[in-house]
Amino acid sequence: MKTQWGEVWTHLLLLLLGFLHVSWAQSSCTGPPGIPGIPGVPGVPGSDGQPGTPGIKGEKGLPGLAGDLGEFGEKGDPGIPGTPGKVGPKGPVGPKGTPGPSGPRGPKGDSGDYGATQKVAFSALRTINSPLRPNQVIRFEKVITNANENYEPRNGKFTCKVPGLYYFTYHASSRGNLCVNLVRGRDRDSMQKVVTFCDYAQNTFQVTTGGVVLKLEQEEVVHLQATDKNSLLGIEGANSIFTGFLLFPDMDA
């Protein structure tokens, strides 16, 4: 760096001497042109010039790279309905619906077999030898005959299905005082005593019997009922039996 500055000062000194020589020569006489001096040091760069006029539009560049995925736009309007698809498989069976309204009354049926429908009769034994409470239904649980199944051995009650005149009878073995009621009605609250049969004896076997004819309506119930005198037996050799049968059906029913 010092060498470069030394050369610069040398050149400046020579230029100065040349200038003085020329000035002196001109002042004395005009001589021939001197030798061109050494080029000066480059000056400081000038300020930027004014913007030039816009250039001609260049050709279209290559497509840029794909940008990032943008956010979802707003929901569009419904499209045009498509064509119907194929019929799908059959679904499972749905729940059972509510019962519909009753249909119209059907036509009158053919006449039935009078003989078959009017045969009503039953006989049943009591084989249970257990004490009875007052007002308890006396159950004759072993069926001998039960035409048309109007007698129910599980509760000892006869239910009328064919209105008409019926005959009911019982034969009861006992050892002591015995009174039984024969009752009728449609339900527990409407049961009424029709007749009471009694027999009195002490420490001896006896058989008590009784019977009655009743006009029954459909769904009326008939059964025997115990009282406070209830020495009824139901053992082998001392049976008790309850019987009933239809005498004449009610033709107007």
UniProtKB/Swiss-Prot annotation:
Ranges for region Disordered: 35-115
Xref: SMART domains: C1Q
One GO location term (cellular component): extrinsic component of postsynaptic membrane
Disulfide feature: C179-C198
Collagen-like domain mapped to chain residues: 29-112
Residues annotated to bind Ca(2+): D199, Y200, Q206
GO biological process: complement activation, classical pathway; innate immune response; inner ear development; synapse pruning
Free-text activity regulation comment from the record: The C1Q subcomplex is inhibited by sulfated molecules, such as triterpenoid sulfates, heparan sulfate, or chondroitin sulfates.
Tissue: Highest expression in thioglycolate-activated peritoneal macrophages. Also found in spleen, thymus and heart. Very weak expression liver, kidney, lung and intestine.
Signal peptide: 1-25
One function term, GO molecular function aspect: identical protein binding
Summary of subunit composition and partner proteins: Core component of the complement C1 complex, a calcium-dependent complex composed of 1 molecule of the C1Q subcomplex, 2 molecules of C1R and 2 molecules of C1S. The C1Q subcomplex is composed 18 subunits: 3 chains of C1QA, C1QB, and C1QC trimerize to form 6 collagen-like triple helices connected to six globular ligand-recognition modules (C1q domain).
Entry protein name: Complement C1q subcomponent subunit B
Gene of this entry: C1qb
